[in-house]
Amino acid sequence: MKAKLFLIPAAISVFCAAAPCAEACTTTIVTKGASADGVVCVTHSNDAFSSDPNIVYVPAKDHPEGSMRAVYPCAIAWDELPEYECYENPRLVAPERADAYDYPWKKRTKPLGDIPEAAHTYAYIDGDYGVMNEHGLMLGECTNNSAHLEYLEPKEGHGIFYASELGRVALERCRTAREAIRLMGEMIDTYGLWGTGETLLVADKEEGWVLEMQPTPTGKGGFWIAQRVPDGEFFVAANQFRIRAIRPNDPDQIFNPRLPDMLKEAGWAACDKKGNLDWVLSMKAVEDYHPYYSLRRVWRALSLAAPSAKLPAKVKNWDTDAYPFSVRPDHPMTLAEIMDLHRDAYEGTPIDRREGNGAGLFASPYRYGDSKWERTITARHIAYTWITQADDSLPCPMFWLSMNAPAESVYIPFAVAPLPEAYEKADRTKCDMTKAWWISQQVTILTRGYYSALSPVVRDAAHEWERRSAKLVTASARQSAEEFAQTLRENAGRVLADWRELHGRLLSVNDGDRRIDYDGAHRPAADKVEKY
């Protein structure tokens, strides 16, 4: 998702985007050989105050011959598009896609175009971006910035696809990552892109790939390239393109054979010091907001996975080659470690966000107002985070979902199946305590106000439920897919019920500050009052 401001190096100049739009995301791949469970995982934090917090099950369907599939716009790409009845919440009004996208009192979203429909489409889980389908195809996403072209508006003559709809078409039609990448590349070449530069992580039960794309200045086709993450390694992206050398005839890369010529024709082509055509340099893939907005998260995630790599926290510029595409973790990463990676605020480092003058009250790691603060992996504007797992030992593919920032929330497992009503049709502008997002929100807001005192209570509760849920998943491995999905829905109900009660327990701890000690990491100096 896109940032509101871009601070681009002096040679390019500073640009302030006028349009209100979404913030940013962090997304990772843990390959089979890098996972303690031997299971491929994809993670994605959906970081935007404007994000629709609903998670939707889209059922499998059969379609009559000659049917067309509508391709819809989305507000999360940049801003709302009233001319298309396209708004932030709900993200889509299209009852033909899923019951959860049926809002009879609202006007239907207007498509940008359409494509021939497949005879059969697979069931999948959907958010602002597609999550996972019934065959274990998994996606993650982050928006990137190209100083050449930061945004291409949707209009006649421009492409009809943004990454969100592109990923959904892949989930509807594909079983494997390679199949999905080739399909999405074909769609880009045929129908074109609009919006911003994007990364889509694409994985299946065996392997993970990174697909990066960028609209062209003409709105025809698009630049795109995909690279495989080697088995046994961990990958992270954080709002900046990560693929470097474009390597023809490399089986670990997939791209339009005309990509090198397209870059030259656009005047974008740039080579690295060895003379290789370089994707990051060709895209002029600068960071959003300010230096380290993206690179700090890349450094931290890679360093958490592989401390022995001793990667530098500081680099010379946005085009640094100090960080490898992926790393081999020092030890296989557990599910708990993957969850906690998305809770990280650089704790224990010289840039620990809980300490120093910029720290919030009660050592909060969050910053408000000016966007030039260090961007942590956890963030105050996270709407939800998912961790997908396609495990053959389970009855069906599953994912873990945390509403709001996971640092103040809990991950709950679900199958690729109909979800509880608590996860559908929530409105961020109207409090509704029957909805999971609002149940989480009341705990989140209270915790952030008294962070050092209350966050340990929340973290302990989250870890306990995550342990219980993991045991339940293992114990349910021999159930049918339908039984497994129901078991997880019932578990979600228990977690949400406890989370409602957790808010009351936190108020008891708070007790109007009487029993709360202020954290020494950020203790404001008192004014000296010694005389009248």
Regions found by a protein language model. Name each.
Residues 18-24:
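Sec/Tat signal peptide C-region and signal peptidase I cleavage site
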Residues 25-162, 183-330:
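A contiguous strand-loop segment
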Residues 294-371, 375-379, 461, 468, ...:
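Accessory, solvent-exposed terminal regions and/or long lumenal/extracellular loops of proteins
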Residues 354-481:
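Substrate-recognition/cap regions that form aromatic- and gly/pro-loop-enriched pockets
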Residues 8-18:
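Bacterial N-terminal signal peptides
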Residues 1-8:
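Bacterial N-terminal signal peptides that target proteins for export
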Residues 459-532:
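Histidine-centered catalytic/metal-binding microenvironments
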Residues 152-156, 166-174:
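Second-shell loop/turn segments in exported
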